[in-house]
Amino acid sequence: MKKSIALVLSIVLLAALFAVPASAGEQNTIRVIVSVDKAKFNPHEVLGIGGHIVYQFKLIPAVVVDVPANAVGKLKKMPGVEKVEFDHQAVLLGKPSWLGGGSTQPAQTIPWGIERVKAPSVWSITDGSVSVIQVAVLDTGVDYDHPDLAANIAWCVSTLRGKVSTKLRDCADQNGHGTHVIGTIAALNNDIGVVGVAPGVQIYSVRVLDARGSGSYSDIAIGIEQAILGPDGVADKDGDGIIAGDPDDDAAEVISMSLGGPADDSYLYDMIIQAYNAGIVIVAASGNEGAPSPSYPAAYPEVIAVGAIDSNDNIASFSNRQPEVSAPGVDILSTYPDDSYETLMGTSMATPHVSGVVALIQAAYYQKYGKILPVGTFDDISKNTVRGILHITADDLGPTGWDADYGYGVVRAALAVQAALG
């Protein structure tokens, strides 16, 4: 088995200093996100200034628009337009993570990170294989026929360039990062390769980044909306006010984002709020800059920011400080395209460990009580919410309680599931 080590945040979104062209052939056309008053906004008026609607959000009052650069002022003055925000380019820092690998399937090994979060001792209770529990992974897509993943890929969708597509070719991972992240969450317990934290959980692969690890903030916001709507495209189909954890709905119960950046765009936050209010636990990488605080979207209070540790329980030097919790993120072995396996490191790799633990908590709780736990808040220290359970059961390696290096500590699946079950 070939192993390659790469430092990956995986994907840090940098706010561009200028608007990104809508396409290479339309250098005078830019993409913007328009927050609107739906009662007053007329989408057809956009055509009158030479623009067109790329995507109309269902869950927030906003639209993605391609418009001539010299018409932005006119757009801002249209009835019903409340705010116009320029889209931001997303880039992968460092070399592309297409490292290749052999197709020979090795005998299964349990990666050190899976052991460190104490996942194997939970599998006799649950491996995450509860029909109402799905984890949406917003990333570069997935190798959907990888023998260590295929059985757990329940749905894939791409939102690249504002176009929603469920065609397999559009969902395919041409970078490797997404396949690696998904393997840490849900690689099968099948005697080959590796095994994930929750080896039975269903995965929604939401491709928001292209082969270069490049995408946009608007693509990510659309991806979050798709995770809420689910394969049937309808949030709260039965109208009972319950979305996550409802067997009549197919929204994800967990959203995992191994990406981040410095820009705080209001429409992205609005979509985060929609997911949080739907009862979805949102987990994101804190960042790889060694900065004193997390990047966005991890910095939002509704999101669990994840820092990275190495196998000696040291905080990785690259890991941004002030995470909510920490998890293994150095020398992480997982699945990779072409039926292979690779070793990567970054807060990107720490994040899926936490997402997998959350999936185990919710699966175990649902099996016993027929419902899922509320998400909770950053300050929770009770057994009544997912975040509270993560906090009180974490391995508190720094000063007692929360600290700026480890957060509440390193997540532990076994104690977390025990706490959830009472």
From Swiss-Prot:
Residues of the propeptide region, as annotated, are 25-106
Enzyme class of the recorded protein, top EC level: hydrolase
The principal localisation class reads: secreted
One GO biological process term is: proteolysis
KW Signal (keyword) present: yes
Cleaved signal peptide residues: 1-24
Occurrences of domain Peptidase S8 (ranges): 111-417
Please provide the record's keywords in A-Z order.
Calcium, Hydrolase, Protease, Secreted, Serine protease, Signal, Zymogen
Which prosthetic group or cofactor does it need? Ca(2+)
> Which EC number(s) are documented for this chain?
3.4.21.-
| Cell compartment(s), UniProt | Secreted
In terms of pH, the activity is described as: Optimum pH is 9.5.
Thermal profile, per the record? Thermostable. Highly active at 80 degrees Celsius.
One of the record's GO cellular component terms: extracellular region
Q: What does this protein do?
A: Has a broad substrate specificity with a slight preference to large hydrophobic amino acid residues at the P1 position.
Name this polypeptide is given: Tk-subtilisin
